[in-house]
Amino acid sequence: LSPEILNYYKENHVAPIREFNPMKDNTDTDIAFQQAIVLGSSEITILGATGGRLDHFLSIVQNLKTAWEKKIPAYIVDSRNLITIPVETSFEIRKEEQFGKYVSFFPLEKEVASITLEGFAYPLDHHCLPNTSGGLCVSNEIVEETAHVSYEGGILLMVQSRD
């Protein structure tokens, strides 16, 4: 953040500004994420998190898990991707409202149990999706007006993307 932009926000009271020592155990995004939870946010969206260091990006994916544990919808969004851990184990995606063309699913634990994908080009019916599944659920496409996703256990990371 340039000094000019920081001064603009400070002088115009656009948002509360908190400054931290750069020598700390948490990333700036971790601190912002925790603050959003403490303030009672009903939804959290992180912008600009995918274009730089992968270690920071993976840390932010862990932040999504923290929000999921508290049943708070949280998203990582850039111009080509919307990444989330859905808080419900059964949900719909309307084709006209989806972000991009592709939908991918990844287990964040050992497995996602009994995943069912309906309305997709590559459907699944009560399939066990292990974390060793590779590309099984990558770049699927919605082929019906509404796609349905359900599963019975595990933590499911969903990526909606476009070229």
Model region roles, listed by residue range:
Residues 14, 43-45, 70-76, 116-119, ...:
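A generic short-segment signal for beta-strand/edge and adjacent turn/coil regions
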Residues 16, 21, 72-75, 102-104, ...:
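A glycine-rich helix N-cap at a beta->alpha junction
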Residues 47-49, 77, 106:
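Short beta-strand segments
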